[in-house]
Amino acid sequence: GYFSKSLKSTKSAADFTSTKLYINLENILKDSDTLFLTVPDGSISQIWDYMRNLDIRNKNICHCSGSISSTAFFDAQNKGAYAYSIHPLCAINDRYEAYKNLANAVFTIEGNSEHLDSLMQIFQKCGNDIIKIDTQKKALYHASAVMASNLVTALFATSIDLLNRCGVDKKMAKNILLPLLQGNVANLATFDIKDALTGPVERND
């Protein structure tokens, strides 16, 4: 099932996933053994402050933040619940299309040991690899993902700007540089990091 603060959003998501629509948190909690808070990072603690006062005994409470650990649900165990963070290493930019990439995504998980293995098995049965990470190293993990994803995009945008300053139209600059980027990604997929290097870095110019 699905619940959101907006009825429109709730209906849209429930229709899209062919699941039940819920109009309050209490009812979806009652009907579920596992809940995923798929919300912005800044909203996790706010929702938890409300949720922790409800009957969450024997519930798996999960969020999908890359940077925040399961300790966001700071007293879940005292409330009889089990806290987890489960994060897909996948670029998601469209709620109605990006889910298609999840089939090939690797997930990471950390949290209470009680149901951790059974949660991992759910993803494994879907064909996904899922890796346990150290709760204390969640920020380090997130920094790795950001550098491989967001920073690459930012560097590519800078490359376009530099070529534009050379008099090349931005659209053309993107088209010119994309094969270069794609070639490097292909090299990374095929060779060790050192052997994937090309150009002045590889030549030590």
Question: Where are each of the predicted segments found?
Answer:
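A structural preference for short, hydrophobic beta-strand core positions in alpha/beta folds
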Residues: 1, 21-23, 132
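Rossmann-like NAD(P)(H) cofactor-binding subdomain of soluble oxidoreductases
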Residues: 16-97
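N-terminal Rossmann-fold cofactor-binding loop
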Residues: 3-7
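Flexible, active-site-adjacent loop/turn segments at secondary-structure boundaries
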Residues: 66, 71, 87-90, 100, ...
